Amino acid sequence: MKIVILGAGSVGSNLHHGLSLNGIRAELVHARSLTAEGAPAKAEVPEADVYIYAIADHALREVVARVDAPKALHLHTSGSMPIEVFGPDKPHAGVLYFFQSFSREVLIDEWSGIPCFIEGRNIDDIAAIYSLAQCLTSRIYEANQHDRERVHIAGIFANNYSNLMYRIAEDVLKGTQIPFEALLPLIDQTAAKVHVMRPKDAQTGPAKRGDHEVINKHLEILKTTPYAELYQALAALIGKEHSR
């Protein structure tokens, strides 16, 4: 089976790396060559049995339209784009959505525990996508667009927004002699707890306890920063959640 990955960004680079580690050769094609001004309507891409589009959502339709391979299996890797992005000229199509945070700077070596959400146009396509996903992980779930969109939103809260909280925490420590590394055991313990208990049950802190004296003191310290309003909103949300 010949595989071509279209897009050499964070997702494409990691997929290429992961497949290579598992003995599967895949050719990586840079998206720039497919979306550059003056690029031909039908791109010259290597022939393949499977095309994996690791392309940003805003450019996906453009790249899909430029690939002329009606017999191949076409897969996108997006959590929010529908399978219908592949038109009738691509009858074999689906989704291969690995639910992980990817970056080109840190390539992932261990894929076996990464969830993969798949969708296909028919039973045969689903079977082929499942077999491909199995080369990397055993945690494979069929998921339509409705479910993928919601898991994508959940992932943004759990990953992207939590990472923003780390950056804010780092900023709050500026002007002190305390390094961000002092927070790492706390961060690790918080993540470890949700492996064995519900997030609601793992919640701690002054907002859960209804300790308004501490909350108000923190708001006073934060009043000259951009974070006071966010702190107050989060404290109110936690307080409401735990007053039920």
Annotate each predicted stretch with a short phrase.
Residues G9, R32-L34, N122:
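Residues in the short beta-alpha loop(s) of Rossmann-like NAD(P)-binding domains
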Residues S13, H17, L21, A65, ...:
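Short, well-ordered alpha-helices that flank and scaffold nucleotide-derived cofactor binding pockets
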Residues L15, N22-R25, H92, I108-H195, ...:
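Internal alpha-helical scaffold of NAD(P)-dependent oxidoreductase catalytic cores
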Residues D188-R244:
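Interdomain hinge/lid region at the active-site interface
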